[in-house]
């Protein structure tokens, strides 16, 4: 579960490496896979598309907390990770690193198509 002031990894090549969650757009106190959050970049790579300290929207693609599926299986990852998106929901980067959990159907199909592995 992700809440305010959570430090997250970035799973794309937009130029950011670490971001800080500064707001949740689902109206709850915590967010999980597939939710959109507001983040501020904290650690960046040189010559990236993003700047340090700027505010972006991001979709959560991996969480450490175990998530139970309808068939009873459980999925959990070793890190909390997001993909930075623009206002239309398209990713800022052109690649997504690592496996991601299946996102809500139709909302982030571009993010899922860029991923190497979708669980």
Curated annotation (Swiss-Prot):
GO terms for molecular function: large ribosomal subunit rRNA binding; structural constituent of ribosome. One of its GO terms (biological process) is translation. CDD domains: Ribosomal_uL14 (cd00337). It comes from the Bacteria. Binds to 23S rRNA. Forms part of two intersubunit bridges in the 70S ribosome. Belongs to the universal ribosomal protein uL14 family. This is Large ribosomal subunit protein uL14. The lineage of its organism: Bacteria, Pseudomonadati, Pseudomonadota, Alphaproteobacteria, Rickettsiales. The gene is rplN.
């Amino acid at each position: 579960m992700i809440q305010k002031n959570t430090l997250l990894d970035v799973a794309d090549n937009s130029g950011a490496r670490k971001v800080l969650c500064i707001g949740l757009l689902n109206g709850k106190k915590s967010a999980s896979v597939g939710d959109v959050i507001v983040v501020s970049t904290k650690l960046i790579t040189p010559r990236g598309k993003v700047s340090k300290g700027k505010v972006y929207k991001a979709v959560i693609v991996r969480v450490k907390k175990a998530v139970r599926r309808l068939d009873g299986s459980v999925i959990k990852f070793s890190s909390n990770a997001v993909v930075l998106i623009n206002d239309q929901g398209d990713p800022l980067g052109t690649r997504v690193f690592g496996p991601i959990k299946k996102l809500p159907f139709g909302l982030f199909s571009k993010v899922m198509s860029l991923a190497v592995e979708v669980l």
